[in-house]
């Protein structure tokens, strides 16, 4: 029986994540104040809704920035993966906050629909256009140069996207009010934008919960991986006890492999590691090699045979 443990060179997030979050926070916080003033002066719910989104975004971006900074801390004997999971926790909290604030806006919009209030369409238009430009800039900052599926940055970008959609909705509502004077357009557009934001927030919430519960990445088919490994490396007769979860942005795996006793243990382990790295981008894997068939009630819960042996 043999064990192997391989690591990626670094689990630390890229510095550009922190820079993008900081710039986006400055832009979002600044224009949030502008929209609060504009919403109060114009009486527009769409602007106030967008300002509410931006307030949540500013807090979310700050939380995300702190999470990235904490995640840079090196591993310790107590926190052996460092603080990488904190970014996933931040994404979860951000998603919850976005769902709550959006539901509150929908509730207020429904009340506004039945009791319309006067809205200054021209001022609303000016502020909405300025907010749209700010959101476009912040959204571009968060996506520029990003080549990793960081849930934390994704959560922050989702908040900004909600504001971007809110600004578009406010512009459309302002145009309708200016041309027709029909003020219910303001809460109606707020509800339509909120529905779009809720859909994306729910998806993010599911992904972050899956990571917090140490579920396997949605994009990874464990059964297919087991069959692929047994097929590509003939010495591997059986793969079982496979566990995969995410720590920050990196997948982590443990597995047991029943193998034909090799002449060179290290060479076989290296081939398995290379396979996992190049085929599935798993750089952190703990592999236990076994020479006997797996016995016990847990073996068949996660087991694939290459066809070399039969199990009873």
Swiss-Prot record:
Its main location: membrane. The chain crosses the membrane at residues 21-41, 48-68, 90-110, 123-143, 164-184. It is a multi-pass membrane protein. It is found in: Cell inner membrane. Keywords: Cell inner membrane, Cell membrane, Ion transport, Membrane, Transmembrane, Transmembrane helix, Transport, Zinc, Zinc transport. Belongs to the cation diffusion facilitator (CDF) transporter (TC 2.A.4) family. SLC30A subfamily. This is Zinc transporter ZitB.
């Amino acid at each position: 029986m043999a064990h192997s443990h391989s690591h990626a060179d670094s689990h630390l997030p890229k510095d550009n994540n922190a820079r993008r979050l900081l710039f986006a926070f400055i832009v979002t916080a600044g224009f949030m104040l502008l929209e609060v003033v504009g919403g109060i002066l114009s009486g527009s719910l769409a602007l106030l809704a967008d300002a509410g989104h931006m307030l949540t975004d500013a807090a979310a971006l700050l939380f995300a920035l702190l999470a990235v900074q904490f995640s840079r801390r090196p591993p310790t004997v107590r926190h052996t993966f460092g603080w990488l999971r904190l970014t996933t926790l931040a994404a979860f909290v951000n998603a919850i906050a976005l769902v709550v604030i959006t539901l509150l806006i929908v509730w207020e919009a429904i009340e506004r629909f039945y009791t319309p209030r006067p809205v200054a369409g021209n001022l609303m238009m000016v502020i909405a256009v300025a907010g749209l430009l700010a959101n476009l800039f912040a959204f571009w900052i968060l996506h520029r140069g990003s080549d990793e599926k960081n849930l934390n940055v994704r959560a922050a970008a989702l908040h900004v996207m909600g504001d971007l959609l809110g600004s578009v909705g406010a512009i459309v509502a302002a145009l309708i009010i200016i041309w027709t004077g029909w003020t219910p357009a303001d809460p109606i557009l707020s509800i339509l934008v909120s529905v779009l934001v809720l859909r994306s927030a729910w998806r993010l919430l599911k992904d972050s919960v899956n990571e917090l519960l140490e579920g396997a990445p949605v994009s990874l088919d464990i059964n297919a991986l087991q069959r692929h490994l047994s097929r590509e490396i003939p010495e591997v007769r059986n793969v079982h006890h496979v566990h995969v979860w995410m720590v920050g942005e990196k997948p982590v795996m443990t597995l047991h492999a029943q193998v034909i006793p090799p002449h060179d243990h290290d060479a076989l382990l290296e081939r398995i590691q290379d396979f996992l790295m190049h085929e599935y981008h798993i750089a952190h894997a703990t592999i236990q090699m076994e020479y006997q068939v797996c016995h016990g009630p847990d073996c068949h819960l996660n087991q694939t045979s290459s066809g070399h042996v039969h199990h009873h």
